[in-house]
Amino acid sequence: MRSDMIKKGFDKAPHRSLLKATGLKDEDFDKPFIAICNSFIEIIPGHKHLNEFGKLVKEAVRAAGMVPFEFNTIGVDDGIAMGHIGMRYSLPSREIIADSVETVVNAHWFDGMICIPNCDKITPGMMMAALRINIPTVFVSGGPMAAGKTSKGEVVDLSSVFEGVGAYQSGKISEEELKDIEDHGCPSCGSCSGMFTANSMNCLCEVLGLALPGNGSILAIDPRREELIKEAAEKLKILIERDIKPRDIVTEEAIDDAFALDMAMGGSTNTVLHTLALAHEAGLDYDMSRIDAVSRRVPHLCKVSPASNWHMEDIDRAGGISAILKEMSRKEGVLHLDRITATGQTLRGNIAHAEIKDKEVIHSLENPHSEEGGLRILKGNLAKDGAVIKSGATEVKRFEGPCVIFNSQDEALAGIMLGKVKKGDVVVIRYEGPRGGPGMPEMLAPTSAIAGMGLGADVALLTDGRFSGASRGISVGHISPEAAAGGTIALLEQGDIVCIDVEERLLEVRVSDEELDKRKKEWKRPEPKVKTGWLGRYAQMVTSANTGAVLKVPNFD
């Protein structure tokens, strides 16, 4: 066993003595040592219940004849961090989480690991660590939140609250109505109830094969999630016995399948960023053009909030992720069904008995929302290395208009609220990329303000930053190269005409190459917004969005 490094031999007497101080007995040194990587944090509703989950996982690990050791990671609630400097720490927290998990697990030579994540950057951070460490691992998330209902019976979620702010600002609802939405938008523990980033990543974790069937859709408060925890411990023991590791599971084909599910569900654009980072950790050269190839062959089968009024509980009721995958498998070439997963079975085996139970929620191949996926990769002179749009969250497929430029999210939100943006405009928010932000903050407040004011179909928004999974409308993010790297987005001037063509996958500014070259020569890189602390270091090390915004290792040659 890997853990023999710290528990076997006469020279490990000091190690055993320390371990006995934690409560271990001599007989425990013949059992596998299991890291329980938890993320219990009281300020995050998706993680508030995970202390109880941790106890259940430890009980299940002991029952399976192994020895559990629980530790915790940090986390950031993107909703609470939204709209202020806290959002700059969100994406960078992914790297801290990955590094901290790597540190604890490799320092103590565990034989296997069960990860308990739930929300936005915590799930991908742990997944990155699992691929980096590469010991048998199973994920079991905290589960989605239920949708809420206002006093009038209207189904609401967190995106409803953000959009309610814009609706109140424009006089469309009263303060009392906004308070009603606020009070009922987040009714329980769990990850926010729509197809936002947290749920998108937990669903992708399931299809990748690192989590068990049901992980993405079973609600946090559903007793079936406790059964999932017990099964996770049993499956981990099998993975250890068979020496099946994360890098055996997360292959190029698995990543194709993850993006295929993402396209079928119209998941968060953040999944592109995080899954590219996973490919990097797995040692795979996975190009963004491959994502677009997946999008072209995968139909969009279900729309979940914010693209519809359906929520994760509806997906679960309709058959869950397995039902979506089973339907997708009917189309040749969409999924790689014979690859191994954390169940010890193939993907084909995992979904063999699944079926769609509500075709209003999960459409059939014969009745898709669209023939192509709900995410698209755009390229052009404004995004030479690519950009991402959640095409499933807007009916508008082509938009052209003059750009209104803001050099920060705060500046943009103030401008939108003051009426500086009108129908037909293309809002540009730049210098908010991985390096320029720093931290590539999400633009949920501006998109929600635009939607809440009734301009969601009449105003486009471009940024080198990110969008929340709760964002909708004509929102193009992850523009690469970013402004801070001298990308074309930095060269735009007020009134330049920008064209977004979703069907043709184009993002262009109607300015000649000669004029852009002239502007590039005159452009000067702004001073970094942050020069000290973690964000200062992050800005110096982070790479572009088109490579997953991972940190580059300095070259010491």
Swiss-Prot record:
The residues annotated as the active site are 468
User: PROSITE patterns in the record, alphabetically?
Assistant: ILVD_EDD_1, ILVD_EDD_2
Per its UniProt record, what InterPro entries does this chain match? Dihydro-acid_dehy_C, DihydroxyA_deHydtase, DiOHA_6PGluconate_deHydtase_CS, ILV_EDD_C, ILV_EDD_N, IlvD/EDD_N
Which pathway is this protein engaged in? Amino-acid biosynthesis; L-isoleucine biosynthesis; L-isoleucine from 2-oxobutanoate: step 3/4; Amino-acid biosynthesis; L-valine biosynthesis; L-valine from pyruvate: step 3/4
- Residues involved in Mg(2+) binding: 78, 120-121, 442
Substrates-to-products reaction catalysed: (2R)-2,3-dihydroxy-3-methylbutanoate = 3-methyl-2-oxobutanoate + H2O; (2R,3R)-2,3-dihydroxy-3-methylpentanoate = (S)-3-methyl-2-oxopentanoate + H2O
Q: Name one GO biological process term.
A: L-valine biosynthetic process
**What's an example GO cellular component term for this entry?**
cytosol
Where are residues bearing N6-carboxylysine located in the sequence?
Answer: 121
| EC number assigned by the record | 4.2.1.9
Q: Which GO terms describe its molecular function?
A: 2 iron, 2 sulfur cluster binding; dihydroxy-acid dehydratase activity; magnesium ion binding
Q: Tell me the leader sequence span.
A: none
User: Which Gene3D superfamilies would you find in this protein's record?
Assistant: IlvD/EDD C-terminal domain-like
The positions annotated for binding [2Fe-2S] cluster are 119, 192
Cofactor(s) needed for function = [2Fe-2S] cluster; Mg(2+)
Top EC class of this enzyme? lyase
- Entry's cofactor comment: Binds 1 [2Fe-2S] cluster per subunit. This cluster acts as a Lewis acid cofactor.
Reported function = Functions in the biosynthesis of branched-chain amino acids. Catalyzes the dehydration of (2R,3R)-2,3-dihydroxy-3-methylpentanoate (2,3-dihydroxy-3-methylvalerate) into 2-oxo-3-methylpentanoate (2-oxo-3-methylvalerate) and of (2R)-2,3-dihydroxy-3-methylbutanoate (2,3-dihydroxyisovalerate) into 2-oxo-3-methylbutanoate (2-oxoisovalerate), the penultimate precursor to L-isoleucine and L-valine, respectively.
NCBIfam families named among the record's database cross-references = ilvD (TIGR00110), PRK00911.1 (NF002068)
Q: Which family does it belong to?
A: Belongs to the IlvD/Edd family.
The family database entries (PANTHER family) matched by this protein are listed as: D-XYLONATE DEHYDRATASE (PTHR43661), D-XYLONATE DEHYDRATASE YAGF-RELATED (PTHR43661:SF3)
Q: Which HAMAP family match?
A: IlvD
Assembly with partners or alone = Homodimer.
Q: What is this protein called?
A: Dihydroxy-acid dehydratase
Its source organism is Bacillus cereus (strain ZK / E33L)
What gene is it encoded by? ilvD
